Amino acid sequence: MKVANIGSPLESRIFQTNGISLHVILAGPANGKPLIFLHGFPEFWFGWRAQIDYFVSSGYRLIIPDQRGYNLSDKPAGIVNYSIDLLAKDIVGLLNELTNSKAFIVGHDVGAAVTWYLIAQYPDRFIRATILSAPHLRVLIKHLVTNPAQLGRSWYMFLFQLPWLPEVLLHRNGWELLLRVLRNTLPPAVFSDSDFERYQESWSKAGSLTAMLNWYRAPLWYPSKLKFNPEGSRARVPTLLIWGKRDSFTGETMARESLAYCEDGRLEMIDSATHWVQHEQPARVNTMVSQFFA
């Protein structure tokens, strides 16, 4: 499989895990160090296009799934099927299928939320982790309850709780609202027109939009068991947090407070970057991650 602007050969596979089928992109030497990337909303495996060639050339075996509900992966009906516990088990099952070795892991946005859970509950499966642009769950909850500014930044989380209306608003006029949110929170020219077309193709698959929104609905109805267990939610592998100072969704304070939930954590701020650090500053992010994983 060849994709424009990605030089490395890509293998597109379907794997059974945790009772569903996940579409996964594999790249790099089969005997390389396993490195799994977990995308955020509203992306899919393609959100890691600026990382693939770099980490393949560094000798890693890349495992890049479309997570549950996204793109070519299964989209089970019902909010109950998108609890963080199930999302994490999808990834554990995938790793069990693909490797007997511990893996490195990188997550962005809601993919980073899954990463936080995995490195707290399944530390024996991971060597080191990198979190991009997503606070620890307990920090997020605290700021949603006590910080009016964060409430304003997180307006979309509350909109997404409504039935059917978010689907209508996001999809109408050729995905106008969703595209506008991306364009307004990214510097110009970070995404090309063809990139946006690939995203729209992914969102347009049957059941995708509701499944993607169910990631936000499930925590309200089916909260993680870690919500009520501060010690059990601590990251138990060495963890690097990378944050853009211009992030429109989560502020620097949340990044710094999240370090308290890491047994061995460090934070790198990128002054000129927004929420989409791996797209805007791929060379810096790739170098930071590579040095941390070395």
Where are these regions (language model features)?
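Flexible "cap/lid" subdomain of the alpha/beta-hydrolase fold that forms the substrate-access gate
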Residues: 1-13, 20-22, 63, 70-106, ...
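Short, flexible hinge/linker loops that cap or flank conserved catalytic cores
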Residues: 16-18, 28-30, 35, 233-235
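C-terminal alpha-helical cap of glycosyltransferases
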Residues: 24, 286-290, 294
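Conserved HGGG/HGGXW glycine-rich cap/lid loop of the alpha/beta-hydrolase fold
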Residues: 26-74
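Residue-level detector of flexible, active-site-proximal loop/helix-junction positions
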Residues: 31, 136, 274
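A short, glycine- and basic residue-enriched loop/turn
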Residues: 44-45, 113, 273-274
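A short acidic, amphipathic alpha-helical/loop segment
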Residues: 50-51, 254-257, 284
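Catalytic histidine-centered segment of alpha/beta-hydrolase-like enzymes
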Residues: 273-282, 286
